[in-house]
């Protein structure tokens, strides 16, 4: 997929326009993402693991494997006018999936797939050409960047934000978090956050500018849909061009830094280790 950073519709490159999707083409395509869309074109993505709260995984049927493809399908569908991203139950992504099974023998063998999925995951999230609202329904302790890269971030009062999948788990934070968090928190606080496994509570995240609103759980989704309806009333081209200008620097930085970060993350995995020693 060709990415261009100067145009108003940066990710609607020729390859995407030529392969436009219809909602029915991908509505039931994914094992870890439930998709619905209302008549206004507001698409709701609910991440889950086997129907329950989402758990992070890297198997071939995991969120890591599917989200990049889902974001690209959404980007290719011209009927999508807003996207709401949320979790299931009372957590966004709070833990890893202990029930995963992998086709590869070790991390070194798995890395080529993880590398490609990692490139697609955040580049394709930022490639969605319409505004995105994150409704963070609980702790976002693993890959919280999925939520905070959205244009509007709403969170319930018991939500927390952390990056426990990388340095605290023995992995290099090279799959985009090294770009996202120093941008949002500032260079020093961002590095502190990544190196220490700090958990930032919802109200503190709002004070830091990471979250736009903190809400009671019962008000989270109604508020997300109210904001989506408000924005969806605008002309389509206003929505798309606004998304383009608001994400331009994020897209540029991610395109420039993600592959390099993944290379460093992969180099740290060259020593063969069992999959349960990630």
Put a short name on every predicted segment.
Residues 51, 59, 79, 86-120, ...:
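Glycine- (often His-adjacent) and acidic-residue-rich active-site loop
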Residues 90-94, 141-142, 246-249:
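Short, active-site-adjacent cap segments at secondary-structure transitions
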Residues 70, 117-129:
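Catalytic-core regions built around general acid/base machinery
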Residues 154-159, 211-258:
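C-terminal long alpha-helix characteristic of the crotonase
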Residues 121, 125, 140-194, 223, ...:
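CoA-thioester-processing core
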Residues 141-143, 197-204:
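Acidic, divalent-metal-coordinating active-site segment for phosphoryl/phosphodiester hydrolysis
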Residues 132, 139, 153-154, 214:
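Short, well-ordered beta-strand core segments
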Residues 8-86:
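Conserved CoA-thioester-binding segment of acyl-CoA-metabolizing enzymes
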